[in-house]
Each structure stands twice: as C-alpha cells, then as structure tokens.
From Swiss-Prot:
Function of the protein: Plays an important role in phosphonate degradation by catalyzing the NAD-dependent conversion of phosphonoacetaldehyde (PnAA) to phosphonoacetate (PnA). Has low in vitro activity with the related compounds phosphonopropionaldehyde (3-oxopropyl phosphonate) and glyceraldehyde 3-phosphate.
Top-level enzyme category: oxidoreductase
Similarity comment: Belongs to the aldehyde dehydrogenase family.
Protein name per the record: Phosphonoacetaldehyde dehydrogenase
Gene transcribed to yield this protein: phnY
Keywords: NAD, Nucleotide-binding, Oxidoreductase, Plasmid
UniProt: NAD(+) binding residues: 155-157, 181-184, 235, 385
Source taxonomy: Bacteria, Pseudomonadati, Pseudomonadota, Alphaproteobacteria, Hyphomicrobiales
EC number assigned by the record: 1.2.1.-
Amino acid sequence: MTNAEVTIAVRHEPMRIAGRLVDTDDRVEVRYPWNDTVVGTVPAGRAEHAREAFAIAAAYQPKLTRYERQKILLATAEALAARKEEISDVITLELGISKADSLYEVGRAFDVFTLAGQMCIRDDGEIFSCDLTPHGKARKIFTMREPLTAISAITPFNHPLNMVAHKVAPAIATNNCVVVKPTELTPMTALLLADILYEAGLPPEMLSVVTGWPADIGMEMITNPHVDLVTFTGSVPVGKLIAANAHYKRQVLELGGNDPLIILNDLSDDDLARAADLAVAGATKNSGQRCTAVKRILCQESVADRFVPLVLERAKRLRFGDPMDRSTDLGTVIHEKAAALFEERVMRAAEEGADILYHPGRSGALLPPIVVDRVPHQSDLVLEETFGPIIPIVRVPDDDDATITLSNSTAFGLSSGVCTNDYRRMQKYIAGLKVGTVNIWEVPGYRIEMSPFGGIKDSGNGYKEGVIEAMKSFTNVKTFSLPWP
C-alpha cells in the first residue's frame, strides 16, 4: 500500500444550493478507481433539490458590473493555481487519472477562468447606420447582450473540473445564474469549485451544484420551466435523450467522438517519429478518456511498416500504475467495467484479424496502453467511442480520397489530426473531413480554451463551446434603435 493510499480521508460533501449546504439521508458513494475504495460521498439529491435551485436562479437578477465579474473570474483562476495540488488530488481520487494529468486539468481550468475574465470586459455590441439605402432613415440600430433566466449545466466524469469550468465561467462572464449537475461518478471537484467561486466573491444565488442519480434528478435538469438553455457534455445516447425532452429550450450538446490521427505517405523517418509521439500521447493522455482522444490511427499503407514500430516503442515507455505516484504516466479508467469493455473490444478486433502488438495485462480499472495493428476499419474498436488508452492502427490505401472516405465513415464528426508536409494535401483534408476541427501536425483535440470547439453528426448539434462561443450561446441579443440626426 502506498503512502497516498494510507492518508486518504473520506470526504462527505453536501450539495451547494445558492451557497447553502444541503444534505440528504441517502448518499452516493464516490470510489477511487485504482483500488475501488470509497473516497467520498455526496447527497442523493432529488428533483425537488434541482427545482429549488432553479427557482432561486430565476428569481435572482445579477447586477455585477463587468469589472466585478472580471475580478471574480480572475480571483478564481488564481485560487486554482494556488490550490492546484489539493484540487488535483481530488480529481485523481475520483477519476483515477495520474497526478500529471490531473495537474494539467487544473492548469486548463486556470486558462478558462483567466480567458473568461479577459473576455467579459469586452463589449461585442454592434452599431448599424440606417442611411445606407434610398429607403433609409436618420437612425442608428444597436445590439446588446442580456443574460438568460437560468442555465442547466450537466457535466461528464472525464474532466471533473475543466468541463464544469467551461460552463460556469462563461455563465458568470455574461451575468447568468447556473445550476450544475456533475455526474455521480466524479462530483466532488465541482463542489470544491463552487466553494472557490463563493470565496472569490460570486453571489451564491448565481451558482448551485446539485448531486444525485440521473434517474432521480436528471429530468428536472432538462425540463424545468425556468431553464432557457441546457448545456451538456457527455455520451451520444444521453445527448439525444436531452434533445428529445428539452423541446423548445436551447441546447448546446457536446457529445462523443472517435477522432482519427491520419498519417500520410509523404513523411520522412523523422516525421514519422514526430507523428508517433502525437499518436501515443493523443491516445493515452487522461487515460484516453477524452472525447477528442486519438481513437483510431489511419496510416497510409506505404509508410505503415516504418510507423508502427515507432508507436510500439513509445507505448512501451509509458509507466502505468498508481495514479498518485508522481512517476506514473497513465492511471486508471473510470471503473473496472469500462476497462473490461474496452479490453473486450481489443480481443474482438483480434478475432477479426487485428494484431495485438502490446498488451501487458489489465488489472481491475488499470488498463495499460494496448497497441493494436491492422485493425479492420469496421471493427467496433474504432467504429465506437472506445474511451480508454487503446492505440489502434488502421492501415489505409495510399489514396487520399479513399482515406478521407474511411475517416468520414463513422457516425461521429468531432475532430481530427493530419500529419503531412504537403500544403495541397493539407487543404484537401481540411475541406474533405466531415468534422468540427481539423488540426495539421497536432492531435485532434488541440485547442485553446476560448477557440470554437464542437462537432457535427453524432458528436454534437453544431453549436460550439469555448469561452467566446459559450458567452454568445448564454445570452439573448436585444436590438434597439434611436433617432440619429
């Protein structure tokens, strides 16, 4: 047993409803995936708890100035940086990712709050002169943005801090009230973030965090009459359930992906080594539990025999094990059931003709970086969203049209990465790939926290996340005009 395991203290957290601590007799256990021990409990909240939170949000009229919003957001960012060890411990304990990955997540959340703080003092209202045509008048038309009644934010397990930050920070920046329902698997980080925001000066009525089982509280998060917008990050089935039940409410749905990294045949040996670095890092960071993780590597046939050994070499270097050990590169996935499912997909791919090149063995939720070559492109391993540190290589023809067709042949359309030095081929793939983002010489998921991000097809409903796009989605545009002699 490690020292980290010996010193774990179980956290019993209440909900935060407009700053008030609310508990229930029934509790939801939060387990450490590394050893399946209970590391915390949260209330098994019910619909009435969400209903109360939305009623408070709807009744409150935020009056924060842009300066005050910026001050709160930047103070939150600084608190995240100052408390990064404590916060990353909570993330690792409830999610199982390595300390290196959880510290990186805290850094990303710092970026979100910093950028939201910078953007909230910027006024993007527009002015239109009306004397532009023979039918014009001596007037000017102006636009301004106003907050919504209440925002419902439903967040996934794989980024317990950053996904909450991406919904809460833009809401604060636009003077909105938001109710957050984190997944029951990793709820404790969201509760800690709420406390940090209250301490930074956020009026408590502007933020509530409710917890509980989806069957008990989920539908209220979607259908409550005070909710103007539902923002959700998570699985495709749940996203479609929200779309079917939210009806006329606005929805920002960021769903799954099976993002490709595409390796083209114009690469030198040095280029292939660089591409292998991207492939392995993109497939295994955060234990592969990212919607934008590299979930299939499409390698053109004529360079595959040179590329695959480079991937194998890098995968074998990864240290996997105790997430709290500072030397660990790769921690666990969310639970043993998920690890077993992804391992089963690997074995099924092998039955379909794939070659398992590296699989040092699974232990509970600890799934190692498994390298699989010659995966059939119709295998579930690469057709479905395999949310773990699997490194599947699909050999594709030395033909760009055929490669693009294969890349587009799944139900998802989130993002992709392409490794090529040919500018004309870059343009062809940017135009031809049916995804929300194309990154050249970078992993599919690369972005900064304020750039537009989102998918098409089953990966989302076309609305974008990122601080700037979220601030637009979280507001109504009011148009008014004045005489202007």
